[in-house]
């Protein structure tokens, strides 16, 4: 990420983004410079208008974090059917005590790990 920041600094200072300038900025910041990464970044940014890219990134809409999206109509029916099947299976297994023993046995391994 330091390499991208160095390129942004050069762009902001109206300096050419080339291998020498990028290396100088990274050296000044105390970064252990890898020449291959410098060359790759300079080549990748060759035809990029950084100002335009920054403006587009800043103007991109940020999705609201209101939880998961509601499923589509067809997906909701399938989800309801899956829930009903899971409930039926749980009800059918209600009298089976072997599952409790399996659950306890699997939990013992975790106790040993964190014990």
Curated annotation (Swiss-Prot):
Asked whether the UniProt record includes Disulfide bond among its keywords, one would answer no
- Keyword Transferase, does the record have it? no
Task: Specify where the region named Disordered lies, as residue ranges.
Answer: 56-115
Q: Which GO terms describe its molecular function?
A: structural constituent of ribosome
A matching Pfam family: Ribosomal_60s
| InterPro entries the UniProt entry points to | P1/P2_N_sf (IPR038716), Ribosomal_P1/P2 (IPR027534), Ribosomal_P1_arc (IPR022295)
Q: List, alphabetically, the GO terms of the cellular component aspect.
A: ribonucleoprotein complex; ribosome
| Coiled-coil ranges per UniProt | none
| Stretches with biased composition (Acidic residues) | 74-106
Name its GO BP terms in alphabetical order: translational elongation
Biased-composition ranges, Low complexity, are: 56-73
Which Gene3D superfamilies would you find in this protein's record?
1.10.10.1410
Superkingdom of the organism of origin? Archaea
**What keywords appear on the UniProt entry?**
Ribonucleoprotein, Ribosomal protein
Q: What does this protein do?
A: Forms part of the ribosomal stalk, playing a central role in the interaction of the ribosome with GTP-bound translation factors.
- Give the protein family: Belongs to the eukaryotic ribosomal protein P1/P2 family.
Assembly and partners? Part of the 50S ribosomal subunit. Homodimer, it forms part of the ribosomal stalk which helps the ribosome interact with GTP-bound translation factors. Forms a heptameric uL10/P0(P1)2(P1)2(P1)2 complex, where uL10/P0 forms an elongated spine to which the P1 dimers bind in a sequential fashion.
Q: From the Swiss-Prot or TrEMBL record, give the protein name.
A: Large ribosomal subunit protein P1
Q: Lineage in the entry?
A: Archaea, Methanobacteriati, Methanobacteriota, Stenosarchaea group, Halobacteria
């Amino acid at each position: 990420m330091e390499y991208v920041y160095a390129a942004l600094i050069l762009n902001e200072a109206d300096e050419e983004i080339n291998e020498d300038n990028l290396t100088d900025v990274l050296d000044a910041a105390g970064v252990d410079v890898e020449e291959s990464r410098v060359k790759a970044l300079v080549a990748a940014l060759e035809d990029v208008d950084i100002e335009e890219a920054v403006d587009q990134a800043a103007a991109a809409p940020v999705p609201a974090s209101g939880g998961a999206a509601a499923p589509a109509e067809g997906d909701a029916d399938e989800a309801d059917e899956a829930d009903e099947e899971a409930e039926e299976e749980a009800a059918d297994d209600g009298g089976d005590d072997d599952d409790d023993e399996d659950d306890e046995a699997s939990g013992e391994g975790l106790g040993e790990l964190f014990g």
